[in-house]
Each structure stands twice: as C-alpha cells, then as structure tokens.
Amino acid sequence: MRAILLGPQRRPTLDAVVRPLFPSGPAGPFATVTAGWQEREPDDGELSALLGGRVVKLELYRRWLDVQERDPEYATAERALQEMLAELQDLYLLRLDYALRAVYALQRRAGTDRLGGTLTERVASPVAEAVAAVRELDAAHLGHVNEVRGEFFARLQPHDRPVIASHRASVADILGGASALVVAGGHVGVLADVLHLFNVAAALQSTALPFMTGRSPVIAWSAGAMALADRIVLFHDRSPHGPGHPEVYGSGLSITRDVVLLPHARARLRLDDTLRMAVFAQRFAPARCVLLEAGTRLEFSGDGGFPSGTRVLAEDGHVTSPAAA
C-alpha cells in the first residue's frame, strides 16, 4: 500500500504534495480523518481548502461519540479496557525507568573506567546486554497490550454490534469512492483507537477499494503518520517535567512497518546527546527511527525500501540516512 508521510503542517505543504499526484484532478474526493483533534474534529476548513474543497469527512471521533451514546454496554467495557491499559502502561514505565537507568549508568561507566582491557571487553557487552533487556521489556509490553485489546474485541465482537457495524459499513463505503485517505495529526492514542474501532485498515485492504491499485495513497503527518505504523512509540525529551523515556504505546494500522516515526524530532529530542539517541535507535532496531521534520515528504510503497531523503537515528546516536547508517 502506498503511504506518503509528511512533516508537521504548521506551515502546510499538503497542497504542494497532492497537486502532482493528481495532475488532472482527483477522480473522487479525499477522505479525511481529523479525529486526533477530538472536539475540534469539525474545524477542518483550512484542511479542506488545501485539498481544493474536494473532501468527504470520515468523522471517526463523532462516530465514536455516537457509539458511546447508543451502545452503553460497549462504552462501559471500553472504559474498563482503558483503565486496564493505563495500569499496564504505568507498570511498564516503572520497570522501564529502572532498566534505562541501568543502561545509562553503564554508558557513563564506559567513560570513567580505568581498569585494563578493551572497552568492548569491559563495557560494550554489559551495555548491549542491558539494552537487550530493555528490548525484551518493550516487546513484552507490546505483546501484553495487544493481547488485552485482542481479548476485548473477541469478547465484545464489534462487527456484531449494530451501531458499530453500521459505522464500519459507512466508512468502508466512503473509502471505496475516495481518491486518497488523508490523516491529520493530534492525539495519537485517540487516532489509533478510532482507526481500529472502525476497521479502517481492513477497509483499505479490501480488493474492492482503489487503494489496492497502488495509485491512490494514504497521506498522513505527525500523529497521523505514527498511527499508520506497526508500533507507536511516544517520546519527549523536552517536556516541562524533564526528559521522559521513549515508551511503546501500542500498535497502529501497520500500513508502514519496521519504522518508528518521530514527528517534531528536533523540538522533542535531544539529538545532540548521542549516547541517549544511540540507546533509542538500538532499542527498536532493526526498525528505523525516522525523523519527520517540517518539509519532510517520504513515500513508502511496502517494498521494504526507504525513500530518498529519509533521515534516521543510527545506532551510534547520529542522524544520518539509511544508506549511510
């Protein structure tokens, strides 16, 4: 499936990206997702203008609110699910903090150790082992999250619930006539939840939809791009409360695989701290940690290759290109 990922759109580039994709104009409207804006979902006038006014809104947040109102059994169960996931995340973060403190302590030891032997013999192996322990923790947490979500959907059977089934059919019908799907940013957790609930990935993969021709793309930026990945990682080194540990949040739509997407990387990450960035990259290898900065345009076709101009965190902690990494 063709995915075009953009940098943040505070200074929009969307119109310039879309124009050459459809030189004769799109055959159908652009299906848009602004659910990440939550209550501001309808405030999409600028987005519509950038797309030439040819938009049809999926209104996934409004649909989710409708499910909350008209299917109280599902709404109650979903609230319980969110409480369980929040508890899982808290326990994971507690363990992650101790695990990463050990990694960073071993890194510092590498710079001060006066004992004999090579650096590799004395320090590199313990650091690698400590990073491996963090990787195991990340993988176990993602597995637990997916297991809990899977059990929830198996028990609640959304496809058999009339309100949800009706919305899913409506979303699939809209996508069937769209020239492209455009996913804006916002709250990545909300985006991922509603994209899963209304079965957007399955609709995109349907052979009845034009997206399978390879000509019609999914276009996304910021949190919208993160929600397309197989693994969503939250990160912020410059929060008011001090640097936070990059944390695995859950699974996205898996339209893009083996990438960890990092919008606003320069603003949110201490890219000059190569030791910290090295741990970041090593934690998620062989997936590439891809920077999505203002002006970025990356096109993924599902062949496993990386577009020209991709900027990634290398395992030595430097920002580079895949060819050089």
Regions found by a protein language model. Give the residues of each.
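C-terminal and late-domain segments of enzyme folds
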Residues: 1-122, 126, 232-234, 238-325
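An anion/phosphate-binding loop that grips the pyrophosphate of nucleotide cofactors and donors
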Residues: 178
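Short amphipathic alpha-helical segments and helix-helix/interface helices
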Residues: 18-19, 171-172, 201-209, 277-281
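Long, low-complexity, polar/charged, intrinsically disordered or flexibly structured peripheral segments
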Residues: 109-162
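Short, charged beta->alpha transition segments
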Residues: 166-174
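Short, flexible loop segments at the rims of nucleotide/cofactor-binding pockets, characterized by
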Residues: 8-10, 157-162, 191-196, 238
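Class I SAM-dependent methyltransferase SAM-binding "motif I" and its flanking Rossmann-like core
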Residues: 174, 184-187, 192-271
